[in-house]
Regions:
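Extracytoplasmic/secretory-pathway segments with low complexity and glycosylation-like composition
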Residues: 1-113
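Boundary/entry segment of secreted carbohydrate-active catalytic domains
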Residues: 111-164
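Substrate-binding cleft of secreted/luminal carbohydrate-active enzymes
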Residues: 122-135, 339-407
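Acidic (Asp/Glu)-rich catalytic clusters
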Residues: 142-151, 165-183, 215-224, 292-297, ...
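Aromatic- and acid-rich polysaccharide-binding/catalytic face
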Residues: 156-159, 289-320, 378-380
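Glycoside hydrolase catalytic-domain groove-lining segments
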Residues: 169-186, 304-351
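Substrate-binding cleft of extracellular glycoside hydrolase catalytic domains
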Residues: 169-273, 277
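Aromatic-lined carbohydrate-recognition surfaces of secreted/lumenal glycan-active proteins
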Residues: 258, 262-288, 338-351, 374-380
Length: 407
C-alpha cells in the first residue's frame, strides 16, 4: 500500500514538472479531413478536424502557406483554405494546436489543357467553304476542317427539303462560328427518287407549297442575318425531280417555279437572303443553261457544282480544275454578266491522278478569276472519298494553297 502511494505521488509530481496536458485516457486521437480531396492547384477546399485542444487558435499548414482557425469547446474546427498555385501531386495538409496535430493529403490534379481554338475565318476575296456529313451542328467536323485547311470555313453548307422547317438553330450555329450559311433548299422529299409528281415544277408554281415557302420567308426575315439560298440546284441534270424532262416537268417549267418561290420569300420581308442559282458544270446531254436562268432580278450569285471523279467511275476520267470549270464559268459570264460566281460544291477523288496537284491548281485557278468569290469543298466520303484528308498529301496541298492565296 505504501509503495503504491509513493509511485502515485511521484507520477503526479512528474506531470506537473513537464507541463504536458495529455488528453484524458480513452479520448480519440486528433483527426483532420479535407473536402474535396482532389482537384487542381488553386482549388478552394474545406479543412475540418476533431480531437484538438478546445477553444484555442490553431494553424493549417500547406507547404509554405498557413491559415488560422479556432477550435470549439469540443476541440473541433472547420476552415476554408486555398490549395497553393504551385502545389503538385499528393500535397500534405497539417492542422495543429499547440502540441496536438494531424495531417491528411490533397491530391492535386493537373489542370486540363484547353482545346485549341480553330483557326480564324480568312478575309481573302476567295472564300473557303465546306459541307460535311454532320452539317452545321457538327462542331467537331467543322473544327477538323478548319485545322486541316489552316482557316475556318466562311461558308457552311446546309441541306433541307420541302418538308422541313426553317433551320434556325443551324443558322445560329454557323453564325456563331463567324461564317455564313449556304442553304441548299431542295423542293422534294428526301429519299423519294426522281419521280415525285407532288413536287413537280408546275405544282410549285401553282402554289401547292405556298404555306411552307412563306413560313421560311418569315423565319428568315425574323432571323435577319445574311443567308445564301441555293434553291433547286443542279437543275440542268436529270437526277432531281425539279429538272426539266423528268417527273412530268416540261421545258420552260423551271423558271416560273424559281420566280414564284423567290417572290414569296421576298414578300415575307426576307431581304437578307441572297439567291444562288447553281447548275452543274455543263456536260454532254445536259440542259442548256440559257433556258433555266431565272433572270438578273431573281438571282444574286451564280454558281457551279463540279467534281473530279477521276477513274472512280466507268464513265469518268481525270480532269483538272481549269478544264472542269472553265467552260461553265464562261457561260455564266455571258448569261449573267457582272454577277459574282461561286463554286458551290467541289472535290476530287484520289483515283486517276494526283489529288494534291489538283487541290493546288483548284485554288490558284479560282483565285485568278476576279469574279469568282469562293468555293465550297464537299468534305464527305460518299460516292468517292472526297474528303480533304483522303491522304496526307491532299490535306497538305489544300492547306498550302489556301495559305498561298492569303499571302
Amino acid at each position: 500500500m505504501l509503495r503504491t502511494l509513493v509511485v502515485a505521488v511521484f507520477l503526479g509530481t512528474g506531470l506537473a514538472l513537464s507541463g504536458v496536458q495529455p488528453a484524458a485516457a480513452g479520448a480519440p486521437a486528433a483527426q483532420v479531413a479535407v473536402n474535396p480531396g482532389t482537384g487542381p492547384a488553386g482549388s478552394a477546399v474545406t479543412v475540418s478536424g476533431t480531437g484538438f485542444k478546445a477553444s484555442t487558435t490553431g494553424t493549417v499548414i500547406v507547404g509554405s502557406a498557413t491559415f488560422q482557425f479556432r477550435t470549439t469547446a469540443t476541440g473541433a474546427f472547420s476552415a476554408g483554405i486555398t490549395i497553393p498555385a504551385g502545389a503538385a501531386g499528393s500535397t500534405t495538409i497539417t492542422a495543429k494546436t499547440s502540441s496536438i496535430k494531424a495531417s491528411t493529403v490533397f491530391v492535386v490534379q493537373a489542370a486540363p489543357v484547353p482545346a485549341p481554338q480553330p483557326p480564324a475565318v480568312s478575309t481573302d476575296p476567295l472564300r473557303f467553304g465546306v459541307g460535311t456529313a454532320g452539317g452545321a451542328m457538327a462542331a467537331a467536323e467543322l473544327d477538323e476542317v478548319a485545322n486541316l485547311a489552316g482557316e475556318s470555313p466562311s461558308l457552311v453548307l446546309i441541306y433541307k427539303d420541302f418538308r422541313q422547317a426553317p433551320p434556325l438553330a443551324e443558322l445560329d450555329a454557323v453564325h456563331a462560328r463567324g461564317a455564313e450559311p449556304l442553304v441548299t433548299w431542295e423542293p422534294w422529299a428526301w429519299g423519294g427518287g426522281v419521280n415525285q409528281p407532288a413536287y413537280s415544277l408546275d405544282r410549285i408554281a401553282a402554289g401547292d407549297f405556298d404555306a411552307r415557302i412563306t413560313e421560311w420567308g418569315q423565319a428568315l426575315a425574323a432571323w435577319g442575318k445574311p443567308v445564301m439560298m441555293r434553291f433547286a440546284h443542279e437543275m440542268n441534270g436529270n437526277w432531281y425531280p425539279w429538272s426539266e424532262g423528268v417527273n412530268g416537268n416540261q421545258s420552260g417549267d423551271y423558271i416560273p417555279a424559281w420566280q414564284h418561290v423567290h417572290d414569296l420569300v421576298a414578300a415575307a420581308g426576307a431581304g437578307n437572303v441572297q439567291w444562288v442559282w447553281s447548275p452543274n458544270v455543263p456536260y454532254w446531254g445536259s440542259t442548256d443553261l440559257a433556258g433555266l436562268y431565272p433572270g438578273a432580278g431573281y438571282v444574286d450569285v451564280v454558281a457551279l457544282d463540279g467534281y473530279n471523279w477521276g477513274t472512280s467511275q466507268t464513265w469518268s476520267s481525270w480532269i483538272m480544275p481549269q478544264d472542269l470549270f472553265g467552260p461553265g464559268i464562261a457561260q455564266l459570264r455571258t448569261l449573267a454578266p457582272g454577277k459574282p460566281i461561286l463554286i458551290a460544291e467541289t472535290a476530287s477523288t484520289e483515283l486517276g491522278g494526283s489529288k494534291a496537284a489538283w487541290n493546288t491548281e483548284l485554288v490558284s485557278y479560282l483565285a485568278a478569276q476576279p469574279d469568282v468569290v469562293g468555293f465550297v469543298w464537299f468534305h464527305l466520303q460518299k460516292e468517292a472519298d472526297w474528303r480533304i484528308n483522303s491522304s496526307d498529301s491532299s490535306a497538305s496541298a489544300l492547306r498550302n494553297a489556301l495559305l498561298a492565296r492569303r499571302s
